[in-house]
Amino acid sequence: MTQASKQQRDILVTSALPYANGPIHLGHLLEYIQTDIWVRFQNMRGHNCYYVCADDAHGTAIMLRAEREGITPEQLIDRIRQEHQEDFAGFHIRFDNYYSTHSEENQYFSEYIYRQLKDNDHIATRKITQFFDPEKEMFLADRFIKGTCPKCKTEDQYGDNCEACGATYTPAELINPRSAVSGATPVEKESEHYFFKLPEFHDFLSKWTRSGALQPQVANKLAEWLDAGLQEWDISRDAPYFGFEIPDAPGKYFYVWLDAPIGYLASFKNLCNREGIDFEHFWKKDSSAEVYHFIGKDIINFHALFWPSMLHDAGFRTPTAVWAHGFVTVNGKKMSKSRGTFIMARTYLDHLDPEYLRYYFAAKLTGGVDDMDLNLDDFAARVNSDLVGKVVNIASRSAGFITKRFDGKLGKVTEQDKLKEFIDAGEQIAEFYEAREFGRAMRRIMELADIANQYVNDEQPWVIAKQEGQDDKLQAICTNALNMFRLLMTYLAPVLPKTADAAQSFLNSRLDWNNRAALLENHGIDKFKPLMNRVDMAQIEKMLDASKEEMPAAVGQPSAAPTADLEPVAEEIEFPDFAKVDLRVAKIVKAEHVEGADKLLRLTLDIGHGERNVFAGIKSAYKPEDLEGRMTVMVANLKPRKMKFGMSEGMVLAAGPGGKEIFILSPDSGATPGMRVM
């Protein structure tokens, strides 16, 4: 093992529990892919890392859906759990245990924690008034009440907020309220509820939220909530309800959000019982193990306020860290069924390779909570350029010569210094993975891939192969290149597990991060088979078509404005005028904001024989981190221009009307910095 991984760590990792009431979609998958990559990395480094999850299987919504389908809630959640597991497996998400909150273990821990809170005098009871459906004989949550918005008078709005004007209100303020379950007019009715005395944990939470367990942005947000004052948390619901009944409280059930995070304990306990793992070692108060929760930023309050308080009061350890991520947009907009961008996991798998999405998400993920845009044009371009055009290309250009000319046997490594750079880069890449800065890791890996491709381009094995007496040189070139490829695939293995497995088989060698310095020499390999195909935009279009739901035109609504006319073609020029323009392929080495500039980004461009500094008016459409490592096209012989912010030494090519609709041009895969655009 390397120095960085000598100390074996015991790590438990969870993702938020998907609700057992519907399918997995691409917005969900960001989190599970992010978590799976991190867990696979930890295991590659030799750590003892477990990944558990479960379906969140309780609540009114599940009870009502099962009723509509004429089945029991148990039958519904069993079916949905099977569907979820199949979807996750399709994306190579590898859980050590995938369980359900509707389990004996979860009931035990829910009751145990509740009794501890009660014994510590942190449970209160009091009567509250709620809307009640007289036909279904059930209390109604805000989302099960509809009526007319009291502010804008839009009909058919939910009981807590208006989707038309954004107003928030109480169900009692709705005009003409009705039950969304039966259609009956609800009545107000009193009921005794159980509350967790969260305000009594203010001092504990003030310290814990600043202990390093949260990202700075999250800790700052929670500080605002703590300053505003915490409220007691209603942890009970009235029958009928699908869930666990509260001990000694007939007809009262634990609210789904009480037993959902407890599902982490239950799923891990189930794994421990099956595999003989010491549960207490991970969850006792003074545990030396590490526990990490990956979640979406919309459920921070449950995981960073309620959950640590419950654990602390019940005698368990608190999480080492809770890491939140942002939401997914598609093509710059909220996922939409009418546009076909509300894409289900199964629909994606029917059309595209899951490792495309794993790589694209990894290439854009940071350790922060910013939202992520899945731009489908960029998705295709990046996968084709990075994975097919760079990484796989190295093996496909080298392996054939080894198989045909040298009976599948590698020779001696002759580029030790170059390979040392690849080996040494593993520690920096490991640091990026550890910090969940996957985008930075991918950019560093692609920098190495560029070096490997440039090496093959410079050495030209296809030319050497035709020369007499150059067999040793040809074998050495291909041996060097395939060792570079092996190191790249080692670093990409957490992101591309299936491709990594195929690479291991082809190379007859395990991809071992900690022993990566052991190079392949005089070693037999198998015949190379294509590892990955290019993304075809036609496949993406078919996926979007399959995801679309026809939306009827709203009565009385004006039709959308017609698309603006395209800008007319400019007047003709003579060819000699055009020939004066020197267009070159350029790699964006660095991209950064320009202080004081609203529209500009500063780009450092590698054009093969030096770097150029260019100011580009593309800030409205691109984040700097999304540009670094990409290939583009620039006007290389444009006279440098002095600007307020510095000297601009060229111009990158982009299309679009402006604003968010600016699209920088990218060359096809295989193009390298400095190539002239013909």
Swiss-Prot record:
Its EC number is 6.1.1.10. GO terms for biological process: methionyl-tRNA aminoacylation. A motif ('KMSKS' region) lies at residues 334-338. Residues 577-678 form the tRNA-binding domain. It is found in: Cytoplasm. Gene3D superfamilies: HUPs, Isoleucyl-tRNA Synthetase, Domain 1, Methionyl-tRNA synthetase, Zn-domain, Nucleic acid-binding proteins. Its main location: cytoplasm. A motif ('HIGH' region) lies at residues 18-28. GO terms for cellular component: cytosol. Its cofactor is Zn(2+). It catalyses: tRNA(Met) + L-methionine + ATP = L-methionyl-tRNA(Met) + AMP + diphosphate. Keywords: Aminoacyl-tRNA synthetase, ATP-binding, Cytoplasm, Ligase, Metal-binding, Nucleotide-binding, Protein biosynthesis, RNA-binding, tRNA-binding, Zinc. Belongs to the class-I aminoacyl-tRNA synthetase family. MetG type 1 subfamily. Is required not only for elongation of protein synthesis but also for the initiation of all mRNA translation through initiator tRNA(fMet) aminoacylation. Homodimer. This is Methionine--tRNA ligase. It comes from Marinobacter nauticus (strain ATCC 700491 / DSM 11845 / VT8).
